[in-house]
Amino acid sequence: MGRREHIGDAGIGLIARDGVHALTHLQVDTEAGLPRGSTSYYARTRRDLLALVVNRLSEGSQADINDLEIPASVSRQEAAEIVVGILEHMARRADAQAARGALLFELRDDVELRELLTAEAPVRRPLTRLAERILVAAGVDQASAHAPDLVGLVDALLMYRAAKAAPVNARKVLRAYLEGLG
């Protein structure tokens, strides 16, 4: 891992633990165990630092779904188990999920950076293709039309878990969703 990635990870940890307001160049230097001024070399402004963290979040999310094999045919319940497995894997990066949630609110007026966390996130297309493959394997009609909704549902379940809002039975929710599709 390079220094840029190390700084990004430190920023993610800071945001998850202390909130977006804690994201300063000096705090990232301290969190990363780097000499004072190191973060400023890679990110001159606060917005540059936010962009570095946002990009690091995207990189981690893509790594979560790389190399997943989906069987050619599965039942709806098996499809739900596959999606639960993906959800559980992504939820292991709890700091990343918490930081992403905090940044969504912080960046609501910054269209460019917000898009990298939402609709235009580099991971969004591969994740939607993965959802479509799961839906096709489960025999869902119009799988491509339903894939973005499945991604949105998984995203909501991740956010709910990261926020520790309340216990939700993701398996039950996903089974009901998949059984309800035509």
Feature names for model-found ranges:
Residues 45, 106-111:
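Short loop-to-helix capping motifs
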Residues 6, 10, 14-48, 52:
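Helix-turn-helix
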Residues 1-2:
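N-terminal intrinsically disordered/low-complexity leader segments
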